[in-house]
């Protein structure tokens, strides 16, 4: 493998045995591709904005004299960039402009004669844009639109599995689900009649819908039944015979023909009898007359002489009727063929319970069901039915729905109309009847071929269409009002409803979620999440076990491990690593093609529907060099079952062992040795890890770390290769390689880094360069590390030296004992940034004022404020300190004469304002790192705001000037090269000022042209700089667009440094979580023979019952990795020759059976080897991919190479006594995470605070400064102890005895420590409730 210069800095040793056939795809593509599809111009009009416009336009007036046509649309440029939107609290969006054409037709002239055409571009609101990391900035906060897994449109056949009816009879049903429009359900009832429901309303006999489609009874019977024809000849009854139909019947008379008896009376007819009849070609037999009684007539029979109806279709025949028919001259009688086996008379029975007789009565019946209480008219009934399933405006199956519908009915073509046809409805009924008759299977609703993904683009398009439809009605009315000659398209379109619909979706839809931004992994997982909840999806309460369960089709599409614990389990899933959606929105996963037992490198993506037809081998099947299966029998999956197949039967093979799991689960090393429940917790807790001060790469990883760090977008990645020309904490400048430049550009890439910004979860986002001056860079290299990344690898926690042993009960019940050294070295110190805002409003009594002049506040409290009343940057503040001084006018109160006198003498006016300053919340302390002031347009800016503005302008100017200088330097270097090659001496040039170079003339025409081109570029660059500077200046100095009534907003950012402390929650990656019980002095920690103390002591009892053995293997492998690091460190300290170092490191990389990774250090220069060694001395990072990890043998070999015992256990000594522990202890390195459940955020104690209004009891919860509830069971406990006075105190003065608790104050102040309990307020509430029931209850005073 070829490594770039940056990748050579630290190479992770890989234990994977299977070669990586397919690279890990870009992990955010599900979001980005979907949104791209939504906003890009699609000439076909299949999807996106284009599809929405085409489905609503053209809009015609009611009279048809005019129409508004859609031509095209374009998206403008966003006003602010992403960062500015976040600071200002606005939405990152682009204006949508649509070109519309108003066509007016002549009234009197023939149809289609155009009178006038007007075309105009109309503004249609703002469309939020996706940032390059797949998020949206809505009102200044980053949000993610989660993809939804919903039932695919189409037709589904299902049964109630015998749960509905008490008899346990299985009732079958069919449901046609459109993409938009009314649902159509067919269902059997326990009496085997077929019913229909529209939109889950009252059921009607299913034949009503056929009558509404204009079928007569005879036509209906013709559709669903085969016929038996009886013929009356010479007073004898003959029946047409199809021998196959006799299967399973018992003969009720002798079946004979041509004098030969084939079946005797009362004998069962067998297959032999049928063969005999077929062989002899018997096609009619004589039957006794009684046989026809009870048969059902297939059509109407009329007496042609009198014109009267003898018997109607679907009537049962009797001998009387037969005689009448015979008299009327009907010699042939068609009856329905039914039997009990597989041709039951469901439709015939249903017709008998159907009250309607013709189309109109059927339509009226449907109208009554849909609109109860409204008088039906013929027209209304016809319109309603027409609009239900046959109008393109109201009903759409969509391409997916039509494809699923046709596949379900086994049709060949998969395309067709989006509305239903007669055939569609009758074929669904036929298939349902076949299933009831035992032919065919019901569908599996949880099969991923029946559930599809709706991503951002599709949901946004649907919302946009909803907005357009709202506008459509208004436009129609406007077109019908007349005076069209003066109208322009923009007079008709109101952009409000459209932008409101879009805004509502992005701002408050259930699937538009506040982004989880704890660390890069939580961002990526949130964007790859798939939810079955949300509009048009399931609800938590109604979802049963089946929906939540893992289904065989999840394999390689949805992760079986990563899902939340609790009520949402199984409803919220995560996309597997390689999964993607196809054009229809079904999930598909890649497989390698197998031909004749040879695995090729051809890769096909299969959806769950296609996968069912193939035999698929697992990724860990053993192959020889030519890609043949070594074993004759291979474990494969086929039709959702796993079994053994011979190697020639195999069609496909899995691409990778990680294919099954999601990104989160694929980061857990030795996942294959963990119990699934614990793996689930492990995958979920990695997302809660807080980025530490200094990220530390995991010693034991899985090889996925780099992909996650790069794809998450928190790192800065090189767009093009080149050399590092300049680097500091806030920017990196790359001089681009010649071959990657565009013609005629300066060839400089500038990367500005994010410094100390707040994330959604209040953690700190900060980027640090990880390249040095002059280093060569390749495209895709990581230039700067973000939060939780280390040299471009995900680093969520820290490698800790752990020992598994009990220690004085401090690790009882999963508690964790931590060494003081961890605190001293700041291993788990995290920075949290809080944003506090102070809003100054315009009130009825006058504007609130931000000022340092606050009434009744001492000098000390104002010491950290400047003259504008805003805190200084860098001030260290604690709970209760004033950050922004603000006063609010209060209403004039009636003054006493004395006060009036004092006022008159001293002119004091201070009492008409009250202090409403922004203070630091209790329990928070930190450093002010930034202040932002936003002032409304037209309000005068205060001194601080002007200072900030000045500073921003300076910074912007500095940035742009530096950028210009860098670009100029690059350009002049090229000018210099042209001039020198054109024959001008270099030392003469160096004496000339640079600006004069461009005035020089060259004899060589080519060179002169080049020079002129460069000169043009230079001018362009300068004018570009001026433009940029102007735009920046405008943005910084303009007033801000604030909410109505708001004059000013001051935002203060506090950075809080949190060290690890008892009560914080920590976890490993295997679901092994615990709370810190004690920070132990270093000297008391157990230590080894070299005197190295351990950092963390974990309880060994937490392992066996939880079955997450992965943590033990990780510990051993971590120890080995550290051991090798120690050896490298020793060699570096001794300053051994590079050759020795190279040999040892090479040995470490070559160890094990890995085929994929071949690190050849002989191609590295000495400097590169030394730099690699420098990065490996703290431990050699190791990758052990999921399901393909290091074996026990390999771990032992690595331990041996590191000079450590292969048992993984060492002798420890007690730090307090120095005695040796009785037996050896497992010690090693485990990757530990600090989770975002910090004791500082949870610890809370109430003094005296606010009370609930009705009950007068203290509120609950930290946010309300509430108390601890002393509930019913706690009362029982005090009762049980007989602690009467304590109980009385709890229920009265400490809770809701209003007078008692105020008296208590007075008593304490007076030094009298008695209490006088009164009546609790809740008792009065009880009295009031009883009175409200009409029972008067009064208390008698004694």
UniProtKB/Swiss-Prot annotation:
InterPro entries: DNA-dir_RNA_pol_bsu_ext_1_sf, DNA-dir_RNA_pol_bsu_external_1, DNA-dir_RNA_pol_su2, DNA-dir_RNAP_su2_dom, DNA-dir_RNAP_su2_hyb_sf, RNA_pol_bsu_bac, RNA_pol_bsu_CS, RNA_pol_bsu_protrusion
Subunit structure, as described in the record: The RNAP catalytic core consists of 2 alpha, 1 beta, 1 beta' and 1 omega subunit. When a sigma factor is associated with the core the holoenzyme is formed, which can initiate transcription.
Name of the protein this chain belongs to: DNA-directed RNA polymerase subunit beta
Group of enzyme by EC: transferase
Alphabetical UniProt keywords: DNA-directed RNA polymerase, Nucleotidyltransferase, Transcription, Transferase
PROSITE patterns found in the cross-reference section: RNA_POL_BETA
GO cellular component: DNA-directed RNA polymerase complex
Coiled-coil regions listed: none
Function in brief: DNA-dependent RNA polymerase catalyzes the transcription of DNA into RNA using the four ribonucleoside triphosphates as substrates.
A Pfam entry, by short name: RNA_pol_Rpb2_2
EC number: 2.7.7.6
Keyword Transcription included in the entry's annotation: yes
HAMAP family reported for this sequence: RNApol_bact_RpoB (MF_01321)
GO BP annotations listed: DNA-templated transcription
Catalytic activity: RNA(n) + a ribonucleoside 5'-triphosphate = RNA(n+1) + diphosphate
Family under the similarity heading: Belongs to the RNA polymerase beta chain family.
MF annotations from Gene Ontology: DNA binding; DNA-directed RNA polymerase activity; ribonucleoside binding
């Amino acid at each position: 493998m070829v490594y770039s210069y940056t990748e050579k800095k630290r190479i992770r040793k890989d234990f994977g045995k299977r070669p990586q056939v397919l690279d890990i795809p870009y992990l955010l593509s599900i979001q980005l591709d979907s949104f791209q599809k939504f906003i890009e111009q699609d000439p076909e009009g299949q999807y996106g904005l284009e599809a929405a416009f085409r489905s609503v336009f053209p809009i015609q007036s009611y009279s048809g004299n005019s129409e508004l046509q859609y031509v095209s649309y374009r998206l403008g440029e966003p006003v602010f960039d992403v960062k500015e939107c976040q600071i200002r609290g606005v939405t990152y969006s682009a204006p949508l402009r649509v070109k519309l054409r108003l066509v007016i037709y002549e009234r009197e002239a023939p149809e289609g004669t155009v009178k006038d055409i007007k075309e105009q571009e109309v503004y249609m609101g703002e469309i939020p844009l996706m940032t390059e990391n797949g998020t949206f900035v809505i009102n200044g906060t980053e949000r993610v639109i989660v993809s939804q897994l919903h039932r695919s449109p189409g037709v589904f056949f299902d049964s109630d599995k015998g749960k509905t009816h008490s008899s346990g009879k299985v009732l079958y049903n069919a449901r046609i689900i459109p993409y938009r429009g009314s649902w159509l359900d067919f269902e059997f009832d326990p009496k085997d009649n077929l019913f229909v429901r529209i939109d889950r309303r009252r059921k009607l006999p299913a034949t009503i819908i056929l009558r509404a489609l204009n079928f007569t009874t005879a036509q209906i019977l013709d559709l669903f039944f085969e016929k038996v024809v009886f013929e009356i000849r010479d007073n004898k009854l003959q029946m047409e015979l199809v021998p196959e139909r006799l299967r399973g019947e018992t003969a009720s008379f002798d079946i004979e023909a041509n004098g030969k008896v084939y079946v005797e009376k009362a004998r069962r007819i067998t297959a032999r009898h049928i063969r005999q009849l077929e062989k002899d070609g018997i096609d009619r037999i004589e039957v006794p007359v009684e046989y026809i009684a009870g048969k059902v007539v297939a059509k109407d029979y009329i007496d042609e002489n009198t014109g009267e109806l003898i018997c109607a279709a679907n009537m049962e025949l009797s001998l009387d009727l037969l005689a009448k028919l015979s008299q009327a001259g009907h010699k042939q009688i068609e009856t329905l063929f039914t039997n009990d086996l597989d041709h039951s008379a469901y439709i015939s029975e249903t017709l008998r319970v159907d009250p309607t007789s013709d189309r109109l009565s059927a339509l009226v019946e449907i109208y009554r069901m849909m609109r109860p209480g409204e008088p039906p008219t013929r027209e209304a009934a016809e319109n309603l039915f027409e609009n239900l399933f046959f109008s393109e405006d109201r009903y759409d199956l969509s391409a997916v729905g039509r494809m699923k519908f046709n596949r379900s009915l086994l049709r060949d073509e998969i395309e067709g109309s989006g509305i239903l046809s007669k055939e569609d409805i009758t074929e669904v009924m036929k298939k349902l009847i076949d299933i009831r008759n035992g032919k065919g299977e019901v569908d599996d609703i949880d099969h991923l071929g029946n559930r599809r993904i709706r991503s951002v683009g599709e949901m946004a398009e649907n919302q946009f269409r909803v907005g357009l439809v709202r506008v459509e009605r208004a436009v129609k009315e406007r077109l019908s009002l007349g005076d069209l000659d003066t109208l322009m398209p923009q007079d008709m379109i109101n952009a409000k409803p459209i932008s409101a619909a879009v805004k509502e979706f992005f701002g408050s839809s259930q699937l538009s979620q506040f982004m989880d931004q704890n660390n890069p992994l939580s961002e990526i997982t949130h964007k790859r999440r798939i939810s079955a909840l949300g509009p048009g999806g399931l609800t938590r309460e109604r979802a049963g076990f089946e929906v939540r369960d893992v289904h065989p089709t999840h394999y390689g599409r949805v992760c079986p491990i990563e899902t939340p614990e609790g009520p949402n389990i199984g409803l919220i899933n995560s996309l597997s690593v390689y999964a993607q959606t196809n054009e229809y929105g079904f999930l598909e996963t890649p497989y390698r093609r197998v031909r004749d037992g040879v695995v090729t490198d051809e890769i096909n993506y299969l959806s769950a529907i296609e996968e069912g037809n193939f035999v698929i081998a697992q990724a860990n099947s053993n192959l020889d060099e030519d890609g043949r299966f070594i074993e004759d029998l291979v474990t494969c999956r086929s039709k959702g079952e796993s079994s053994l197949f011979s190697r020639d039967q195999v069609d496909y093979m899995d691409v990778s062992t990680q294919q099954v799991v999601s990104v989160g689960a694929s980061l857990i090393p030795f996942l294959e040795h963990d119990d699934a429940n614990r793996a689930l917790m492990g995958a979920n807790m990695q997302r809660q890890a807080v980025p530490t001060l200094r990220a530390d790469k995991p010693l034991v990883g899985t090889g996925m770390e780099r992909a996650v760090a790069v794809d998450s977008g928190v790192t800065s990645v090189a767009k093009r290769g080149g050399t590092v020309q300049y680097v500091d904490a806030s920017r990196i400048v790359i001089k681009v390689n010649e071959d990657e430049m565009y013609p005629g550009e300066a060839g400089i890439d500038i990367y500005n880094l994010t410094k100390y910004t707040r994330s959604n979860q209040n953690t700190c986002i900060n980027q640090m360069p990880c390249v040095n001056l002059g280093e060569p860079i390749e495209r895709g290299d990581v230039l700067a590390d973000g939060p939780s990344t280390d040299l471009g690898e995900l680093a969520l926690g820290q490698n800790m030296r752990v020992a598994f042993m009990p220690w004085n009960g401090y690790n009882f019940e999963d508690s964790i004992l931590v060494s003081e050294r961890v605190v001293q070295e700041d291993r788990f110190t995290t920075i949290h940034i809080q944003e506090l805002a102070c809003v100054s409003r315009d009130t009825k009594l006058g504007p609130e004022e931000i000022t340092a002049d606050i009434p009744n506040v001492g000098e000390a409290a104002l010491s950290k404020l400047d003259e504008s009343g805003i805190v200084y940057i860098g001030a260290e503040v604690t709970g209760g300190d004033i950050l922004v001084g603000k006063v609010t006018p209060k209403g004039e109160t009636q003054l006493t004469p004395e006060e009036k006198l004092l006022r008159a003498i001293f002119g004091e006016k201070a009492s008409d304002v009250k202090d409403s300053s922004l203070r630091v919340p209790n329990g928070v302390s930190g450093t002010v790192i930034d202040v932002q002031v936003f002032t409304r347009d037209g309000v005068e800016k205060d001194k601080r705001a002007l200072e900030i503005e000045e500073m921003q302008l300076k910074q912007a100017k500095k940035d742009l000037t530096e950028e210009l200088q860098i670009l100029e330097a690059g350009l002049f270097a090229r000018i210099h090269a042209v001039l020198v090659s054109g024959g001008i001496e270099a030392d003469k040039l160096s004496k000339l000022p640079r600006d004069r170079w461009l005035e020089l003339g060259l004899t060589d025409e080519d060179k002169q042209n080049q020079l002129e081109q460069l000169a043009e570029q230079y001018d362009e660059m300068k004018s570009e700089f001026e433009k940029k500077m102007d735009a920046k200046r405008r943005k910084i100095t303009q007033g801000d667009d604030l909410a109505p009534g708001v004059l000013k907003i001051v935002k203060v950012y506090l950075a809080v440094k949190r060290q690890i402390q008892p009560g914080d929650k920590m976890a490993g990656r295997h679901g092994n979580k615990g709370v810190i019980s004690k920070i132990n002095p270093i000297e008391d920690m157990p230590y080894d023979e070299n005197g190295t103390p351990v950092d963390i002591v974990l309880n060994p009892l937490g392992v066996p019952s939880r079955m997450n053995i992965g943590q033990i293997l990780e510990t051993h492998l971590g120890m080995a990795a550290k051991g090798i690091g120690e050896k490298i460190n020793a060699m570096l300290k001794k300053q051994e020759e590079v050759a020795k170092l190279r040999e040892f490191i090479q040995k470490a990389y070559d160890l094990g059976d890995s085929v994929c990774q071949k690190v050849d250090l002989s191609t590295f220069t000495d400097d590169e080897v030394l730099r690699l060694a420098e990065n490996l001395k703290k431990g050699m990072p190791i990758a052990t991919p999921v399901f393909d990890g290091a074996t026990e043998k390999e771990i032992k070999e690595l331990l041996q190479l590191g000079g450590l015992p292969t048992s993984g256990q060492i002798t420890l000594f007690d730090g307090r006594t120095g005695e040796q522990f009785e037996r050896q202890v497992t010690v090693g390195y485990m990757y530990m995470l600090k989770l975002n459940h910090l004791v500082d955020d949870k610890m809370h104690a109430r003094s005296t605070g606010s009370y609930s209004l009705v009950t007068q009891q203290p509120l609950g919860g930290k946010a309300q400064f509430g108390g601890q509830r002393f509930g019913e069971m706690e009362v029982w406990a005090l009762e049980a102890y007989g602690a009467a006075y304590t109980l009385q105190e709890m229920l009265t003065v400490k809770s809701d005895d209003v007078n008692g608790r105020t008296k208590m104050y007075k008593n304490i102040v007076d030094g009298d420590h008695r209490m006088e309990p009164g009546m609790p307020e809740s008792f009065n509430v009880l009295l009031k409730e009883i009175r409200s029931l009409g029972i008067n209850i009064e208390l008698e005073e004694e």
